[in-house]
Amino acid sequence: MTLPERLPWLFLAASRLRQALFLLFAVILVAGALYTARFGVYNETLVRVGGLGIGILLLLTRPSTTRHLARLLLDLALTALFVAALVRYSMIANMLEFGLYFLVPIDVVLGVGALVVVLEMARRAVGLPLVLVCLVAIGYALFGQHLGGMLSHSGVDMDSLMLTLWYSFDGVFGRPLAVVVGTIIVFIIFGTLLEALGAGDVLLKLAMRGLGWLRGGAAHAAVLASALFGSVSGSAVANVVGTGVVTIPMIKRTGFSGRFAGAVEASASSGGQIMPPIMGAVAFIMADLTGIPYLYICLAALIPALLYYGSLFACISVEAKRLNIERPDRALLPRMTGRDWLMLSTFVVPLGLIIGMLMLGSSPARAGFMAIAVALGLGLLLNREARSLKALQVAVTGAASASAKILVAVAAVGIVVGVMNLTGLGLRFASAAQALSDGSLLMSLIVMAMACLMLGMGMPTVPAYLIIILVMGPAVEALGVPTIAAHMFVVYFAVMSAITPPVALAGYAAASIADASPMGISVTAVRLALMGFLVPFAFVYSPSLLLITDFALGEFVWALLRLGAAIWMLALFAGRGHLWAIAGMLGAILLVLPGLYLQIGVLALAVLAEALYRLRKSGRFGQLNSLSL
């Protein structure tokens, strides 16, 4: 008989204690984030160190179904180790700030222990790939002087490494973590609150009422609802799981295959992170890194996001026509009741408030706080189910869990950032990237895109974006790319990694709901979302698409015409067989690349091919041949 079987009361007591501690830490994290958003940061060390500390304690006390004694003891040991490291940090924080303290062996030991805990929590929260990248970075810092050649550095001892990574704001507690604690958590709370209030269901109903009458209307409605709610939720997988349970079966019932239904939801949910005004979490970190106001970043993201979702709508329309899916009867579409319109205010009013406050110069955190207050007030007034203590607890714990995951992910990225700054690795990578691309902007962009896709396959958008932009961003900007274009380029490919095989996390999430092959869904999602892979190249070569940098009306209009034609070719040609699909893909790629005469030639060929296809389809092609003879 095992120990849990002999002492069930002990494990029951431990489970209840974990639940109580988890709820306590969740309340502290949410309350602290709201307080900081409302009143500002009065102690930077307390906010950063305390925020990460609460986040890790949340993950360590998260309720678990395991009854393995070893796992419980491990969590207890990690908790004790991390608390000891935090206590030690607080004891020497003031002396460290003024440079009046030199680390002693116990500081180094506790610093190493704290990093071990951070990496283990990152492994549990976001997976092994990010941890492996961090371990490679630490190994490079300690032993990189023996590599020789371009990658060699002057050497880093353990004291200097711990001082940078743990006992300063240059590593784990760097600026990205401050942005998460000070701003991003507020918007995570906002998104979780909207979900708890039922805003997602009302948005889907509104989308179905507005677009459901179209051919393939259920799929169109799913795209619109996922775009709107995905911008707030900030997670492709969470959005697929949250809205997909309703939208995917709904799309299948109208005549689409499970594979196509899952692909539509996966591609639409992934795009939520590039849809203004909230864009998940990455826009806030981008604003901090670039110094560009958050509202300007939202404006820059607008046209590319509309092009992306426009291509999804076009692909759905073509597929619906190919399958002979008829328009549904408008009378059968769900009607928006008076209560639905009132509940819609819990989404529209707070979102409008955020935009209005940002335009008036308010900080994103303050705008998010006010939006939460308004959404909560409206929700409690209009939704009786939201007034229960259980509903509030679910919202708080959900927001805290999501926040804890992004906290440890960004903290782990801080290890990589700290090593890069300490060793000069970033400059070496930039030089290597320039040498590899031989000064070619296109090659540099392709290398950066591939790196984003590979890193993004195993980690969330934010850490993938941070690592790539810090490593390769300077090299691309050195080739004349505007800062905002370089950052947006990385974000797009980090987002697209969620549907890119072989990992394709959003595709796997949709597969279980659609009852279809995960790989099949991912391949179809990539086909639907091809504009998501092409638009980044377009706004690098035509920065006017971003509206806020080097704007030229002629370039903007010509770029829109070319991208509109690319959407048309990708969608229409894909429904005519493999050769047409390949031709459409090649044509779309050539329309994105620079070269005026090349672009005009591609457009002319596309129009000619379409005209010949229609003539042949109508039977008049043969008549023309006979007349010419």
Show which residues each predicted segment covers:
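Transmembrane alpha-helix interface/packing and boundary motifs in multi-pass membrane proteins
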Residues: G191-E195, S226-S235, S267-Q273, L358, ...
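Membrane-interfacial loop-to-helix junctions in multi-pass transporters
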Residues: V104-V109, G171-T183, R209-V223, T254-F260, ...
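Core transmembrane alpha-helical segments of multi-pass membrane transporters/permeases
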Residues: E120, A125, L135-M150, M158-D159, ...
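Long, contiguous bundles of hydrophobic transmembrane helices that form the permeation core
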Residues: T2-Q19, L299-A402, L505-L591
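Hydrophobic transmembrane alpha-helices that form the pore/transport pathway of multi-pass ion
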Residues: L204-G272, V282-I285, G291, T461-Y492, ...
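Hydrophobic or amphipathic alpha-helical targeting/insertion segments
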Residues: L73-A84, S90-M95, V108-Y167
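Membrane-interface helix termini and inter-helical loops of multi-pass transporters
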Residues: F39-G40, A93-L100, M162-L163, M420-L436, ...
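Conserved, well-structured core domains of diverse proteins
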Residues: M1-F98, V108-V112, S626
